[in-house]
Swiss-Prot record:
GO molecular function: carboxylesterase activity
UniProt source species: Yersinia enterocolitica serotype O:8 / biotype 1B (strain NCTC 13174 / 8081)
Enzyme Commission number(s) of this protein: 3.1.1.1
Keywords: Hydrolase, Serine esterase
Pfam families associated with the record: FrsA-like
Role this protein plays: Catalyzes the hydrolysis of esters.
Protein's recorded name: Esterase FrsA
InterPro entries: AB_hydrolase_fold (IPR029058), FrsA (IPR043423), FrsA-like (IPR010520), FrsA_esterase (IPR050261)
Top class in the EC scheme: hydrolase
Gene3D superfamilies per record: alpha/beta hydrolase
Family: Belongs to the FrsA family.
Reactions performed catalytically: a carboxylic ester + H2O = an alcohol + a carboxylate + H(+)
Amino acid sequence: MAQANLSEILFKPKFKHPETSTLVRHAHCNQAMNVHSALDGDTTSHWYRMINRLIWTWRGVDPLEIEEVLSRIACSKAEHSDNELLDTVVGYRNGNWIYEWAHQGMQWQQKAMEEADPMNAGQYWLNAANLYSIAGYPHLKGDELAEQVEVLSNRAYEEAAKHLPYTLKELSFDISDGGTLTGFLHMPTIGSAPFPTVLMCGGLDTLQSDYHRLFRDYLAPKGIAMLTIDLPSVGASSKWKLTQDTSFLHQQVLQALPNIPWIDHLRVSVFGFRFGANVAVRLGYLEPQRVRAVACLGPIVHHLLCNADSQRKLPDMYMDVMASRLGMADAADEILRAEMNRYSLKTQGLLGRRCQTPMLAGFWENDPFSPKEEAKLICSSSADGKLLPISSTPLYDNFHRALLQTSQWLEDKMR
């Protein structure tokens, strides 16, 4: 089916779709929590979503384009589900978050389809994929429009790979409950298969296609492949609920890697962002024979999951994401917080025990989601731990340096 026709079919004008901020029914406090986080962005007065300029720019979205779309959303006079929040326009129309970002993505998609130069076309497809992904953000369960735009993001991501100098393979993995899971294997032009491979574990509010930059700029130049798998309840893994066994899907993928001819299953490491670090560190404990090393940035493995004061300071969107992932969209806050406690790797009896898998943990000072103690706990639990402090200013440059250091460390551990 042609891309243009697909978008027309998916997005027939309709005003009865549930608005994103109404999907989780916990007690929204509707007040600015003044949260500033390198990996999650900023809370902004009168916005439901956290505005994540650093990561969106890092993925390749033009900062001016970000402001242009945000201004279109902010100016809308259409009906809102909450008149205090700018990004809550009801229905797929002008001013709606998903509509405006998807509209921007469709412009790049059209440009890609008309472009003759392969490199330019590939970049335009990537631009479209990034914008479609932001349209679906924060990817809450049951968000019909977001689920539709995620289809466009994946299609655009696959189209980009046809034009750019790397190989993308869509892999299917059989899961023990009878389901089939899909992941993307990115292979570099440097070296030859089987490749040393990094298994990517992203955050709770991201898609597996959001980490192309990590592969292109940090792993591919070292001849390292990247395998991406969505966290349970997100994207291609949406049929599975996130449980206390957070590494359930990734562990089965790891166990299947000896059957993948393009991957050197004896040289596999795991990289976790935010809650993805929970999965990554868990794998380091459960699969030490299969995992050469674990790296994580801004890990969420204990503190936020157990500290009630920190949880109370979380923005509404982030609590909604947690509730959505845990399948607790209707639960009272107290019940949700009690359940979150069970996801702590320390509560589960893992962190704090000695682990032979080398682990690197990067942290930002005054990170509201992941304090320095979180990273120190991971490093001190490993027989070969490395603590990586990351300065907050200049934010973009230091994020880049942290990724350079982390990718070099992973390469060294997979030699």
